[in-house]
Amino acid sequence: MVVDPYQKREAKRYKNPIPSREYISSCLRTSQDLISQKNLEKKFGINNQESKKALRRRLRAMERDGQVIYTSNRCYVAPESLKIVKGKVIGHRDGYGFLRTETLKEDLWLSSEQMKSCIHGDIILAHIVETHGKRRSSARFLKLLQPNNILIVGRYYIDDKIKFVIPDDTRFNFKIFIFSAIKDDISIGSIVSVKLKQHPIRNSRVQGFIVEILGKEMGTNLAIEIALRTHLIPSLWSKEVKKQVYEISRKINQYDFKNRTDLRHFPFFTIDDEDARDFDDAVFCKRKANPEEGWILWVAIADVSCYVQPNTPLDKAALERGTSVYFPSLVIPMLPEKISTDLCSLKPNVERLCLICEMSLSKQGELISYKHYEGIICSHGRFTYNEIFKIWNGDIFLRSKYKKFLKDIENLSCLQNIFNKDNISKKGIYFENIEPKFVLDSNLRIKSIYQNIRNDAHKFIESCMILANVASARFVEKYKYPVLFRNHDRPKKDNVVSLRLFLNELGFTLLGGDSPESVHYSNLLKNVSDRPEYEMIQTVLLRSMTQAVYSPDNRGHFGLSLSSYVHFTSPIRRYPDLILHRVIKYLLFKDKNTSKSNYNFYSAHLYSTGEIKKIGAHCSITERRADEANRDVIDWLKCDFMYKKIGCILNGVISNVTTFGFFVRLNQFFIDGLVHINSLNDDYYYFDSLGLKLIGKSTKNTYCLGDALKVKVISVNLNEKKIELSLYKSS
């Protein structure tokens, strides 16, 4: 007889435990027939009325969550048996949508007819409708499990006395009819936030009411406000959080020194961008007593866990945010400024509590051993990447200005020269991405754009942080306790096949068989680095990759070519790093068998697998939403900037090719605009998905990734964040 594997867990939770959800689902999946509750009771040996009622409640809860289906003949069945899946609706601007599930590799297609019963962001149950040939399978809406209850931002209009809002997010492809407003004299065209009162039901209107009037004239600040509401990003602190922060002392007392290693005499430096807002890491290195034996590298990370303790209002607020959100003109921090820009900011000449990762490196820069401990440091200097790079390259003024630090700065340079040759951070896939930087004017509009060039100082700090993350992963992995790993899965097989076909068209080969390793991708990039196709190949390689996620299951990091990886170095701005610090502290104190009275026990914490899994899924989502919110604001800023360039003739390179045209990246501004296929009137063009190009049916003229073109800016739609271009041909 099979025993419920979660029996002990249920016994801890309930006085009279019944079979777990997982066990019930397993029994239904393996059953050949539909099963009634009565037969389930017999199968599980449930006889008393109290347990029968508990089982009924559990089955209803499972039905509500889409884990079981209750049929018309009063039986239960697993959704998989009926090809029924639970998923999240992803809307599309053209009215159709997709259903994203946790179990299927590919999203299911939702027709515009099916989308009349749901909206973007809904969690639904749907029936899989198989299709033949190359088309993807579709989904038929069955039941709304969890409606998307977010506030929808859009513009307010009146037409023939009918009030409605058109959503700013085009994935909501419908009008919201307003039956009541917070006031009657709202100006037409005002940007408002709306709460839905009635979800779409076939052939019925979506209804809602206005919650807030955000403004009328668009600007950077309003674009940020819209992004925050669209992506449900909290930006205010509760009274409880403010109270807790107020009570935190700014002074380090003698108790804080207990069991900490005093490193204040070590010349730690912070090295960041000119416009950096967080200073949560500092580095110091020196040669070993015998230089032939290598180096010792110290990475000091602000001890956020000392101030943000588990399950406090501050901790809950940080978890809800998951990450800091960086807009061009503003930061929405994960932690209040008293912590993020003061107590945990490693400012020069100020004592700060840190968690230290001390690493022993070989002469070749390889990680030999490591140790973690609580420390206290005093940063000796705040440098920028450009300053360090210039000092390394002999800048007379800076070398004179920082004369007393030259020996230690030169040590950093020596270690970077070793890193440049070969070390753990060089074994992964390295993409040379173009990173545009915006200079804003007094109105927070783009004044100018320049390319941010990564120099050796950037690469050095990146290598130091990767090493500290690897050392931390190796440390926690030894104990087998639940932690959040940073997983980057290998590319999906379909993506590898498509990539190989594309490369074959160009005459290049990706080695590694069915499952190429990171080294094969890296070698390919090195082999084509001096070829004109480099940018194009790098773009396609990058698009073939999966997204990195947080999970308690260690699956390794494909991009970095590492068997295990965690995030340790940014607890000010990333919640997973804060969790890792707490677990590391727990393991340190557990090893020392130290009594609670001898250290700050409340900054250490161990999590259950269930807690870690839930937090990992949440933090993966908050990371994506932060990226999307930032992208929304940057796209608006770009469109606002390009609005003044309508009519201009500019040079660019094709950055993406689709069925409806191709995008051109403007060389001068690093901004993409669309050349629509309908504007190519010299021929009928079709999309070649294999070679990622458009081909003229008669002329055989082609437009493919990397082609250099001259284009004209035709129009800019600020509301839809679209830039339209056309090919420019001189007369």
Swiss-Prot record:
UniProt-recorded name of the protein: Ribonuclease R
InterPro entries: CSD (IPR011129), CSD2 (IPR040476), NA-bd_OB-fold (IPR012340), RNase_B_OB_dom (IPR013223), RNase_II/R (IPR001900), RNase_II/R_CS (IPR022966), RNase_II/RNase_R (IPR004476), RNase_R (IPR011805)
Limits of the S1 motif domain: 647-728
Subunit note: Monomer.
Gene3D superfamilies for this protein: Nucleic acid-binding proteins
MF annotations from Gene Ontology: exoribonuclease II activity; RNA binding
Keyword line: Cytoplasm, Exonuclease, Hydrolase, Nuclease, RNA-binding
EC number(s) stated in the UniProt entry for this protein: 3.1.13.1
UniProt source species: Buchnera aphidicola subsp. Acyrthosiphon pisum (strain APS) (Acyrthosiphon pisum symbiotic bacterium)
Chief location of this protein within or outside the cell: cytoplasm
Catalytic activity: Exonucleolytic cleavage in the 3'- to 5'-direction to yield nucleoside 5'-phosphates
Keyword RNA-binding annotated: yes
